[in-house]
Design a protein with these regions (language model features):
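Structural detector of coil-to-beta-strand junctions
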Residues: 225, 270-272, 293-294, 300-302, ...
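Extracellular beta-strand-rich, repetitive "passenger/adhesive" scaffolds
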Residues: 71, 165, 201-203, 223-232, ...
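Acidic Gly/Asp/Thr-rich repetitive segments characteristic of extracellular carbohydrate-active
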Residues: 195-229, 240
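Extracellular beta-strand-rich solenoid/capping regions of secreted or surface-exposed proteins
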Residues: 213-218, 233-248, 255-284, 288-310, ...
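Bacterial N-terminal signal peptides that target proteins for export
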Residues: 1-9
Length: 487
């Protein structure tokens, strides 16, 4: 225990004081956030409130604005030019669960710009972990969703109004609005095969699963990349990626893979990219699933990697899947510039057998479990010799999960969380070092408990620490010796 205490103090000193000497903390954020409670409004400002099962607590800064009657609005002045918008909002659930639909009108300088379609289909979970969609079980969480709007032309000084113009929902709550100057759509890279050549049209109306599979097979055979032109592409099954496969899109705002809502209840019909070999590259596209419940017996959708050494995943936007990314038995991974939004579980998890891997300059918001996790779970027998460790979470920003923590390390050797920003972590700790989850196997004589030196350095925690469903109250930064000592 003495060893644990000494090391814990070292970590806390580094976290508390080194930020003043080491420069930037968190990810590079290309958007400007406008908080609803700071806007001009005819609605009601809610909060701050601090406690479980409250929409205010799940809000940025624990404040938000509630629009009730048609005609009520929030309004703000644009600080810098932008062509893309994200609105974080909350609608009520249907009386029996399943969500409702509504709309908001967006005005620019008094002129109707766009009507946003909103839904609560992917929010509202209830009861005990892993939660349900049944309102009668009480204890609600996961109040918020987001919608994206692009191809705008907003100038500094423009006045933007979001107005409730729809009576289908008794209210609409606005938490925040992000404005961003999204980069133009990228051109096709040299030495690539276009998905369009295999029958996909980019309108999101047809099933593009087989077209993508054929394009990947042909590109791999020819040693070329797969090119995803700007557009929307529907996927209804697994996309298996062999070694050295490369998929490149026109940008996370431009090339989007979506799931089929009517099929998303079937675990094998979801949007799932499976990395099954080394040196794979995924770049510049978005994945938008359709998951609205958690079942840990079902395979994760999003991106899964197994034995995918030295793979690079850059500038991906992943939303409405169970996890953003989950990796096993891999080394030398590089994840950079990614956004994980509104997942049902983790944003990113370096799980069993992951070593010498890095996630950097990436962000999460609205995840249903840890924003960024390092969990060296017990290995399968075939991988018992792979020792996890030396993984790094660096220059990342985690915000507003509805369960669990910002950055979490559950064991392993010499793992690090550095230069990170965690804000509004109301259901858990900003940073958690814990032995709660299993990391050892007596049968395989493997023990992946904490070893070497675990480092948390130059991190900033804002509005962190709160009610955890299993542990009641968490600290802003917590050491949890649940099943084993840390020594």
């Amino acid at each position: 225990m003495k060893s644990f205490i000494a090391r814990a103090l070292l970590v806390l000193v580094l976290a508390s004081f080194s930020q003043f000497a080491r420069g930037r903390i968190g990810a590079d954020i290309p958007w400007t956030t406008y908080e609803a409670e700071e806007m001009t409004t005819t609605g009601i400002v809610l909060g701050p409130k601090y406690g479980p099962f409250l929409v205010e607590t799940e809000s940025s800064g624990q404040k938000c604005v509630k629009l009730r009657a048609p005609g009520e609005y929030v309004e703000f002045t644009v600080q810098s030019s932008a062509n893309a918008m994200v609105v974080r909002y909350s609608l009520p659930d249907a009386a029996t669960g399943g969500g409702i639909d509504s709309a908001l009108a967006v005005y620019q300088n008094g002129k109707l710009l766009k009507e946003l379609s909103l839904t609560s289909r992917y929010t509202w979970l209830y009861g005990k972990y892993p939660f349900s969609n049944k309102p009668q079980e009480g204890k609600p969480r996961n109040f918020y969703d987001e919608c994206r709007l692009k191809d705008l032309s907003l100038l500094k000084g423009d006045v933007i109004r979001l107005e409730k113009n729809d009576a289908r929902a008794p209210y609409c709550i606005i938490d925040l609005i992000d404005l961003e100057q999204a980069t133009p759509a990228l051109a096709a890279p040299a030495n690539s095969l276009s998905l369009a050549e295999f029958g996909a049209n980019g309108r999101g109306e047809m099933d593009d699963t087989e077209a993508l599979r054929k394009c990947i097979a042909a590109a791999s055979k020819q040693g070329k990349a797969v090119w995803i032109p700007a557009g929307v592409y529907k996927l209804t099954g697994d996309i298996d990626l062999p070694a050295r496969a490369s998929i490149r899109g026109a940008g996370m705002w431009h090339s989007t893979f979506v799931g089929a809502p009517e099929l998303y209840g079937q675990a094998d019909r979801r949007v799932r990219f499976k990395l099954n070999g080394s040196n794979i590259r995924l770049e510049d596209f978005a994945i938008v699933g359709g998951l609205n419940y958690r079942n840990d017996l079902e395979a994760n959708d999003g991106i899964l990697g197994n034995r995918c050494d030295n793979s690079v995943l850059s500038r991906l936007w992943i939303e409405h899947t169970k996890v953003g990314m989950w990796f096993y038995y891999s080394s030398g991974l590089m994840i950079e510039g990614c956004r994980f939004r509104n997942t049902v579980a983790d944003g990113l998890n370096f799980c069993a057998g992951v070593r010498s891997s890095l996630v950097q300059n990436s962000t999460t918001r609205g995840t249903g479990d840890d924003c960024f996790a390092i969990w060296p779970a017990p290995p399968d027998q075939a991988f018992a010799t792979l020792m996890p460790g030396s993984n790094v979470v660096r220059h990342c920003t985690g915000q507003l999960p509805f369960l669990a923590n910002g950055g979490a390390i559950y064991g392993g050797a010499d793992n690090r969380i550095e230069d990170c920003l965690f804000t509004d972590i109301s259901p858990g700790a900003g940073i958690l070092l814990s032995t709660t989850f299993p990391t050892s196997s007596e049968q395989l004589k493997v023990d992946n408990n904490f070893s070497g030196t675990t480092v948390v350095r130059n991190c900033e925690l804002r509005h962190c620490g709160g009610f955890d469903h299993g542990w009641e109250w968490r600290a802003a930064m917590q050491f949890c010796l649940d099943r084993k000592s840390i020594s």
